[in-house]
Every structure is written in C-alpha cells, then in structure tokens.
C-alpha cells in the first residue's frame, strides 16, 4: 500500500519543500510531531545538524548501535538536556547512516559569543561516543562523521527572529520526508527521536534520628524505679 503523498507546499502551519517530488504523509507527520515536541520542551536551544555512519559490518544492528551512541553521548554530558530528531538513510553503496538534528538546551550556557567552544565540545563528544560504540579508531572515525551546521542555530522564543528561524528549519528538515523508490515506508524505522533523561537529584542519606525517651502517662504505667 503506497503512502499518501503531499504535493502542496504547506503542511499544517509550516511551508515544506516539495520541489524535487512529493513527501510521504506518514513521514512528514512523524517529523512534525517530533519537531513540535522539541519546541515545547525548549524555549531556548542551540541546534546542531550532522550525519553519522557506521562500518558496514554493523549494518544489521544499526538502530541498536545508534541508541547506544546516544546514551553514551548523554553520559559524557550529564548536565545537559538534549533532544534529537533522526532520519535513517541507506546509501547507494549499501552503507547505513543517520542524519541527526540535535537540540541542546541553552539555559545553562552563556550567550552565543561562546558558540565555537560549544560546537567544538559537541563535535568532540559526538565523535568520541561513536568511536567507542562502534569500536572504531579515532583515525578512521572522521570518515563516518559529517558536521553540517556551522555555526550553531539559536532558537530563542524571546527573540524577534524565532518565528522565522523555526519555520525555516522545518522547511529544511521536511526534505527528509521525501519518498524513496519504495513507497512502502516503515515510518518507525525511518524517522524518530531521542530524548535525554532529566537528571534526578539523588536522595541524601537519611540522618539517624536521636532516640528520645517518651514521657509515659502516669495513669497507665507505674513510674520508673529510683536508682
């Protein structure tokens, strides 16, 4: 059964890119709800787009490896809140790669004057997590990583350009919902999202209470004997 195809230039409140052909309705819907979820989670975020591949010998466990990669990446950044929208792609060579749009909560960070340092550290942690997950050397891992966003995109609901920027970003991301030659798209394995768990403050160890002698009611028990 073929997917419904969107030929118009809009989906809900967003303009979408249909220049090179129609978009899959199930894919654009999945992308839309993932995107709106991120915007509702973060009022101010930095957006980093990149693509990661894996050695072909790991193709059969690609999804599991990228799950491991994300949780390892979050382990490196325990104080960050992160959401990621991913799109799986199969290249002509048969290699599998994932396109990621990462949203980093900007609240703990200084203004974008430090954009380079933020992006540099993100790049380092993303690469390190992938190298460890796929057991690939640091020398070879660069061939599997492609970083697309330079500089980072800043989405801030308090800025006048927010409405324009977040609409432009969705327009760019809508290209990921294009139909492949096989219209029977498995939506769940093609587009999805990762969300970092909120850091929970561990319970402080309970201090032992000092035992206090209870005053006994004289009407029910006899008074203690004198020494």
Regions found by a protein language model. Name each.
Residues 81-88, 136-139:
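Low-complexity, flexible helical/coil segments
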């Amino acid at each position: 059964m073929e997917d419904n195809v969107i030929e118009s230039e809009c989906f809900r409140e967003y303009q979408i890119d249909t220049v090179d052909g129609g978009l899959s309705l199930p894919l654009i819907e999945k992308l839309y709800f993932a995107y709106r979820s991120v915007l509702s989670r973060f009022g101010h975020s930095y957006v980093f787009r990149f693509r990661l591949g894996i050695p072909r010998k790991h193709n059969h466990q690609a999804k599991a490896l990228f799950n491991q990669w994300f949780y390892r990446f979050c382990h490196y950044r325990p104080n960050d809140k992160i959401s990621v929208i991913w799109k799986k792609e199969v290249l002509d060579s048969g290699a599998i790669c994932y396109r990621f749009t990462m949203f980093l909560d900007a609240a703990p960070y200084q203004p974008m004057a430090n954009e380079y340092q933020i992006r540099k550290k993100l790049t380092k942690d993303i690469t390190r997590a992938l190298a460890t997950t796929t057991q690939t050397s640091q020398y070879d891992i660069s061939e599997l990583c492609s970083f697309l966003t330079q500089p980072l995109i800043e989405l801030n609901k308090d800025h006048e350009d927010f409405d324009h920027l977040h609409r432009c970003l969705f327009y760019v991301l809508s290209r990921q919902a294009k139909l492949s030659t096989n219209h029977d798209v498995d939506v769940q394995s093609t587009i999805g999202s990762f969300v970092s768990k909120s850091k929970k403050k561990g319970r402080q160890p309970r201090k032992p209470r000092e035992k206090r002698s209870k005053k006994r009611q004289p009407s029910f028990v006899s008074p203690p004997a004198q020494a």
